[in-house]
């Protein structure tokens, strides 16, 4: 998603710096829009215009490019057969997350979803994970969080959750943090977890 924001801003001659990239890590889409609108008042439409443009890109991305990670369907099938509760805790807007899951016939695997709209705070704080565990009736130690954002892996681990880090090129700079905070790591495919859970 960082690349989407960078690509959108580039069309206005704005090149996102490493400092700006780090500052926005863990922000919701509205927070990112406000951050860049404040820094670049010349952006057409301010924060609402940026939100609208980014929203179009995100919608297109979910509809045409985003796909499930290799092996995830078989993995989810296995968890469901074992009666393991599953939920989603995401900073993605609910409408985008639900549409992506529905379009890929994946909604039925999950008991519920919590989003940034439900908790109002980034994954630098453990609220979204703690509320998800509470809603499932489980202690953090009895849950496993699957995350690709290194800072979010660290947050979940510090809150007492078991963590499975998912290596993603977009977070290459933080891969050592992801590995340090993770009990398990998915390099490329969920098939790698066979016999580990």
Task: Mark where each language-model region is.
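N-terminal start-of-chain detector that recognizes signal peptides
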Residues: 5-6, 57-60, 85-87, 116-118, ...
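Generic anion/oxyanion-binding catalytic loop in active/binding sites
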Residues: 10, 21-22, 61-64, 86, ...
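Residues at secondary-structure transition points
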Residues: 23-27, 45, 49, 63-70, ...
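Asp-based, Mg2+/Mn2+-dependent phosphohydrolase catalytic module
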Residues: 77-80, 93-197
């Amino acid at each position: 998603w960082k690349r989407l924001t960078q690509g959108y801003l580039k069309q206005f001659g704005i090149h996102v710096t490493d400092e700006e990239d780090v500052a926005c890590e863990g922000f919701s889409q509205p927070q990112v829009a406000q951050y860049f609108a404040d820094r670049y008042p010349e952006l057409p439409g301010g924060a609402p215009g940026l939100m609208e443009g980014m929203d179009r890109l995100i919608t297109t991305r979910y509809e045409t490019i985003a796909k499930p990670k290799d092996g995830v369907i078989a993995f989810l099938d296995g968890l469901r057969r074992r009666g393991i509760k599953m939920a989603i805790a995401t900073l993605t807007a609910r409408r985008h997350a639900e549409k992506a899951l529905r379009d890929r016939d994946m909604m039925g695997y999950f008991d519920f979803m919590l989003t940034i709209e439900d908790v109002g705070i980034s994954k630098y704080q453990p609220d979204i994970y703690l509320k998800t565990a509470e809603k499932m009736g489980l202690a953090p130690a009895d849950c496993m969080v699957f995350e690709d954002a290194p800072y979010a892996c660290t947050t979940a681990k510090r809150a007492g959750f078991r963590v499975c880090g998912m290596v993603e090129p977009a977070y290459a700079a933080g891969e050592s943090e992801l590995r340090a905070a993770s009990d398990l790591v998915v390099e490329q495919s969920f098939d790698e977890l066979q016999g580990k859970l």
